[in-house]
Amino acid sequence: MESANASTSATTIDQLCKTFNLSMHTLQINCVFCKNALTTAEIYSYAYKHLKVLFRGGYPYAACACCLEFHGKINQYRHFDYAGYATTVEEETKQDILDVLIRCYLCHKPLCEVEKVKHILTKARFIKLNCTWKGRCLHCWTTCMEDMLP
């Protein structure tokens, strides 16, 4: 799948599939971190999260679910700037909270309006990691809360 044009033009799973005339179901792509092949479910999840494809040595790479979560945690510990409520995010970005691209700090999915509103209603803070605002998606929110239960 090596191609000079692909490495410069295809930045998403969808674009990669179109460039090489493949379906997501038949695409085989490795994790940039652990080098294992992504499962079909991980490929669909990666595309759903609007994450970018990386090229190394002319070959495309993505990230498996395990490595995404692992590196999300590492990023949280290494690059934590500060935490703030929705008003802080709005003041800093000069945008309405619903218009700001905020990703989950664990799975990296873009937060939808419902997830942002949940942060506001529960008075949960967004966190700024490496100069980028992050939050928790509903899936990871539930997972985090389960860890707190006896």
Swiss-Prot record:
<dbReference type="Pfam" id="PF00518">
    <property type="entry name" value="E6"/>
</dbReference>
<keyword id="KW-0010">Activator</keyword>
<keyword id="KW-1035">Host cytoplasm</keyword>
<keyword id="KW-0479">Metal-binding</keyword>
<keyword id="KW-1090">Inhibition of host innate immune response by virus</keyword>
<feature type="zinc finger region">
    <location>
        <begin position="104"/>
        <end position="140"/>
    </location>
</feature>
<keyword id="KW-0244">Early protein</keyword>
<dbReference type="InterPro" id="IPR001334">
    <property type="entry name" value="E6"/>
</dbReference>
<dbReference type="GO" id="GO:0030430">
    <property type="term" value="C:host cell cytoplasm"/>
</dbReference>
<dbReference type="GO" id="GO:0042025">
    <property type="term" value="C:host cell nucleus"/>
</dbReference>
<comment type="subunit">
    <text>Forms homodimers. Interacts with ubiquitin-protein ligase UBE3A/E6-AP; this interaction stimulates UBE3A ubiquitin activity. Interacts with host TP53 and EP300; this interaction inhibits TP53 activity. Interacts with human zyxin.</text>
</comment>
<keyword id="KW-0899">Viral immunoevasion</keyword>
<keyword id="KW-0863">Zinc-finger</keyword>
<keyword id="KW-0945">Host-virus interaction</keyword>
<keyword id="KW-1119">Modulation of host cell apoptosis by virus</keyword>
<comment type="similarity">
    <text>Belongs to the papillomaviridae E6 protein family.</text>
</comment>
<dbReference type="GO" id="GO:0052170">
    <property type="term" value="P:symbiont-mediated suppression of host innate immune response"/>
</dbReference>
<comment type="function">
    <text>Plays a major role in the induction and maintenance of cellular transformation. E6 associates with host UBE3A/E6-AP ubiquitin-protein ligase and modulates its activity. Sequesters tumor suppressor TP53 in the host cytoplasm and modulates its activity by interacting with host EP300 that results in the reduction of TP53 acetylation and activation. In turn, apoptosis induced by DNA damage is inhibited. E6 also protects host keratinocytes from apoptosis by mediating the degradation of host BAK1. May also inhibit host immune response.</text>
</comment>
<keyword id="KW-0805">Transcription regulation</keyword>
<protein>
    <recommendedName>
        <fullName>Protein E6</fullName>
    </recommendedName>
</protein>
<keyword id="KW-1048">Host nucleus</keyword>
<feature type="zinc finger region">
    <location>
        <begin position="31"/>
        <end position="67"/>
    </location>
</feature>
<keyword id="KW-0862">Zinc</keyword>
<dbReference type="GO" id="GO:0008270">
    <property type="term" value="F:zinc ion binding"/>
</dbReference>
<keyword id="KW-0804">Transcription</keyword>
<dbReference type="InterPro" id="IPR038575">
    <property type="entry name" value="E6_sf"/>
</dbReference>
<keyword id="KW-0238">DNA-binding</keyword>
<dbReference type="GO" id="GO:0039648">
    <property type="term" value="P:symbiont-mediated perturbation of host ubiquitin-like protein modification"/>
</dbReference>
<dbReference type="GO" id="GO:0006355">
    <property type="term" value="P:regulation of DNA-templated transcription"/>
</dbReference>
<dbReference type="GO" id="GO:0006351">
    <property type="term" value="P:DNA-templated transcription"/>
</dbReference>
<dbReference type="GO" id="GO:0003677">
    <property type="term" value="F:DNA binding"/>
</dbReference>
<dbReference type="GO" id="GO:0052150">
    <property type="term" value="P:symbiont-mediated perturbation of host apoptosis"/>
</dbReference>
<dbReference type="GO" id="GO:0039502">
    <property type="term" value="P:symbiont-mediated suppression of host type I interferon-mediated signaling pathway"/>
</dbReference>
